[in-house]
Amino acid sequence: MMRKLLLTSLFILTVWTAVGQTSYCLSYDDFVQDRWVTVDTLSVVRRTNSAKIWSGGNDYRITASDKALDKVVAKQAFVVRQGDSLYVNCRHLQRQGVLFGKGYAKALRYDGDKLCMINIRCGRDEASSQAGVAFMFGAVGAAVKANSMLKNRVCYLIDSTSDGKRMEATLMDEDFMGDVLLMDKELLEKYKSVEKEKNRESAAIILPILLKKGLIKAF
């Protein structure tokens, strides 16, 4: 039961206003080195569908009442932290030359000093439509079943600096998960039993596996 509650707190994407204990990093290197800038308040709100269409499908908009800080958060900050929650600024990210656009996406610390971003599909080879997911991993999967958003999201690895402007986000697809599960034959077979490639890329499938492997946890 405790494990289900932990999973729910990790993966449910909510709408709230952040007050206190909020900080941000200006770069990936700052994140790796744990160099955070503390601020008083930031507002985190779910973006409307129309806003996503015109400026990128990222789920969140983070703002500050102070104009100078608001500009930093919108254009310069790399990642924002509020309590145990992380949000990565998609303005700095791309995949296959396609920009993610404005706004923030939910993220989790991955394997210590990397980030696992939960977002829509992006890239030259990705369609805009989302695949549903019918397969779950027992009790672990049950903890995230209520969160339908995860069915329509995929996971990306953010693990290195860029050429100075944009960072490349790596899709956690079947090849990626094959490497992750290379030494875990049983879990690999269970993962491959999920019907359809798009479903195997769903965050609802990927996240419970990463948790079980100890690659993600609460920040």
Tell me the role of every PLM-derived stretch.
Residues 1-25:
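Bacterial Sec-dependent N-terminal signal peptides
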Residues 9-17, 30, 35, 46, ...:
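Generic low-complexity, intrinsically disordered sequence content enriched
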Residues 13, 33, 51, 205-206, ...:
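Intrinsically disordered regions, especially transient/low-confidence alpha-helical propensity segments
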Residues 180-219:
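C-terminal partner/receptor-binding element of secreted or periplasmic proteins
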